[in-house]
């Protein structure tokens, strides 16, 4: 059904502990995008952090969006945690730009 509909789906919090399940869905459905809010700050140092990095590497960075989850996570802390995560897992400059702002810009302009 995800391939039949044109409606964009923005999956929040990267699916949390189900990030690998979400990745499998998103790989098959070009209308599914994944937001990183909350999950990176919450799961720092866990196996889920590694699963998120694996999922981004597996899918590519084009449908992953930065999200702060403000006010539940302080905006500055969220940006800091996300940038540390991206650096720690060896993401390239263009992948970081995609995740941090380009994909969000493209998503909201494409589906306005």
Where are each of the predicted segments found?
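Mid-to-C-terminal alpha-helical segments outside catalytic/metal-binding sites
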Residues: 60-63, 76-112
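Catalytic pocket-lining loop regions of alpha/beta-barrel enzymes
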Residues: 1-65
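Residue-level detector of alpha-helical recognition elements and their boundaries
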Residues: 37, 49, 67-70, 101, ...
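Conserved, mostly hydrophobic/aromatic
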Residues: 13, 34, 69, 96, ...
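Membrane-targeting and insertion segments and their boundary/processing signals
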Residues: 53-56, 70, 78
């Amino acid at each position: 059904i995800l391939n039949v509909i044109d409606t964009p789906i923005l999956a929040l919090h990267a699916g949390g502990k189900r990030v690998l399940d979400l990745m499998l869905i998103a790989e098959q459905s070009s209308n599914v995008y994944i937001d990183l809010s909350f999950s990176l700050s919450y799961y720092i140092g866990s196996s889920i952090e590694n699963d998120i990095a694996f999922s981004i590497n597996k899918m590519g960075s084009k449908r992953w969006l930065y999200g702060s989850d403000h006010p539940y996570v302080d905006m500055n802390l969220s940006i800091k945690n996300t940038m540390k995560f991206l650096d720690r897992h060896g993401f390239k400059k263009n992948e970081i730009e995609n995740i941090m702002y380009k994909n969000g810009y493209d998503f909201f302009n494409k589906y306005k």
